[in-house]
From Swiss-Prot:
Name of the protein this chain belongs to: Deoxyribose-phosphate aldolase
Gene name of the record: deoC
Annotated organism of origin: Shewanella woodyi (strain ATCC 51908 / MS32)
UniProt entry keywords in alphabetical sequence: Cytoplasm, Lyase, Schiff base
Top-level taxonomic group: Bacteria
Compartments, record wording: Cytoplasm
């Protein structure tokens, strides 16, 4: 198998197949669940809005895909600075049955010089997840932009108990970049290699996925990237990966992200 095909296969196994669109419906989420069961194996998870968790759970169970995790989003997409609301949304997501919660860090507060708020929000949302769900924290690296801010956000999230740090919401002009990924995974290598990394948005093909995986191998070791420590947040990427593996276009995802 070529390196490109190996990257494509691994990226499918590490994918959070995502639909986070304003026009999402039960039917679109059902279709997403079917796409997550790919000819090359199941994706690691799907990522959907909280209200669709029950129908997704029912569909995945019917497909015999109980191993596919259900991720959802809170404090999304703007990363507001109201801790109480972020916690309420996170508790509700867990009550709906989410396995994983992707919460948006209050990145604008950090840009204004407030480091405490982000730490406290992540800490409180981690407590809200308890033992029922893992917490991924979206730092919106494309808006933070400054390497020092990307590093600081990553450090604060890890110190506050995040299980993963994630680049982006996919709702801003600049999403996952190799430059941000290098900073974020360097912080993981320094602080806690059990913390995971999730590039989201803008990873369009197997070659790009391979670049992120290669960076992870260089910074954290060849065997580090597993579903427990690495995810790709993506929708249209799956089509390219299946095409790379010569498995056709059985999985046309929602456009974007």
């Amino acid at each position: 198998m070529s390196d490109l095909k190996k990257a494509a296969q691994k990226a499918i196994e590490l994918m959070d197949l995502t639909t986070l669109n304003d026009d999402d419906t039960d039917q679109k989420v059902i279709e997403l669940c079917h796409k997550a069961k790919t000819p090359a194996g199941n994706t690691a998870a799907i990522c959907i809005y909280p209200r669709f968790i029950p129908i997704a759970r029912k569909t995945l169970n019917e497909l015999g895909c109980e191993d596919i995790k259900i991720a959802t989003v809170t404090n999304f997409p703007h990363g507001n600075d109201d801790i109480a609301i972020a916690v309420l949304e996170t508790r509700a997501a867990v009550a709906y049955g989410a396995d994983e919660v992707d919460v948006v860090f209050p990145y604008r507060s950090l840009m204004e010089g407030n480091e405490t708020l982000g730490f406290e929000l992540v800490k409180a949302c981690k407590e809200a997840c308890g033992d029922d769900a893992i917490l991924k924290v979206i730092i919106e690296s494309g808006v933070l932009e400054d390497p020092a801010l990307i590093r600081k956000a990553s450090e604060l999230c890890i110190d506050a108990g995040a299980d993963f740090i994630k680049t982006s919401t996919g709702k801003v002009p600049v999403n996952a970049t190799i430059e941000a990924a290098e900073i974020m995974m360097t912080v993981i290598s320094e602080k806690n290699t059990k913390v995971g990394f999730k590039p989201a948005g803008g990873v369009r093909d197997a070659a790009a996925a391979g670049e992120f995986l290669g960076l992870a191998a260089r910074l954290l070791g060849d065997d580090w990237a597993t579903p427990a420590t690495f995810r790709f947040g993506a929708s249209s990427l799956l089509v390219n990966l299946l095409h790379t593996l010569e498995l056709g276009e059985e999985a046309k995802g929602p456009q974007g992200y």
